[in-house]
Amino acid sequence: MFSNNNFIKATEQYNTFEKNVPAYYFRRTFHSDHSAIAKITIAVCGFYEIYFNGKNITKGFLSPYISNTNDYIYYDEYEVLLDVGENVFGILLGNGLQNNPGGHIWDFDKASFRSAPMFSLYVTQGENVLLCSDENFKVKPSPIQSDDYRFGEVYNANYELDGWCQKDFDDSSWESALPAIAPNGELRSA
């Protein structure tokens, strides 16, 4: 059921030494008529944190496994209990090695797998797909104005948005996510 057909991103931009691409917030609300356990499957090109109804549910740090996404794209799975009524998914998506400016030593700026950070997410209950990543996700730059695997991050607290992954947050001024061309790699469980 999970496929790499539904990748989305926040921007077309690439990180360079002259211009950094911030990590982006992504959020999406949806309605559930009943409380039930659902499975989230997420494949990411970049590093991410995932939030459900305001709670960080990410497994570990620097998720997912690092890979050449022309070969493999690792995905993670989570189980959550849906609330009756509104539910919200939040994702903080950083560059990881996917959008690394590289340099003279590592040449990541010339890597064939290079792209703006992107992800594909499916929420399922048994065989039923409840939600998948699409342009209905809303995006906004996060306080992480620059993140690089080797050079660290620049954090600007002026961009903090309290409650951005909570149910009652107003995201009406946020932009819509963009569709992304999926990498060629084979999907593998992390």
What are these regions (language model features)?
Residues 15-16, 21, 26-160:
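Accessory beta-strand-rich segments of carbohydrate-active enzymes
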